[in-house]
Amino acid sequence: KNWRVMYLDIDVHHGDGVQWLFYDDPEVLTVSLHESGRYLYPGTGGVHEMGEAAGRGFSMNVPLEPYTQDGSFLEVFDRVVPYALEQFRPDALLVQCGADAHFSDPLADLLLTTRAYETVFRRLLALADEHTEGRLVLTFGGGYALDATVRIWAMLTLLALERDLPEALP
């Protein structure tokens, strides 16, 4: 069976490499929520980048303005990700869980808190159960504020393993 895969990139940088790899492939939907390329490397990820040939319409980019905070990010996530899953109907969801949109990251200007990451991860687990029968691959990536990155990745691991989160992650 040819699997349809949705690739979601929530790293602060545009998911350009994966997007270009599947730019003409209608079996892979790439969705990237990232800080706008007008301000941040690699300078790509505009809404006009939608795929080509048979893959036209299978690349979705949501460039966010610098200083985007939890509420706005979660609103965008809630409007885009469930809709993309409902419309595309993938067999599996692969998520690049960058930790560099955290407010303490020195290389970018999105202002997410650890609580926003927790909310996103919980929603991803529920969405995967609902739309892909739980077929979910989570990868780590991005994160240059080491304390925040370790906390975010530890939290993601605990949630994926269905473990309780401690009151404070060290």
Residue ranges and their predicted role:
Residues 1-170:
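A general "terminal functional-core" signal
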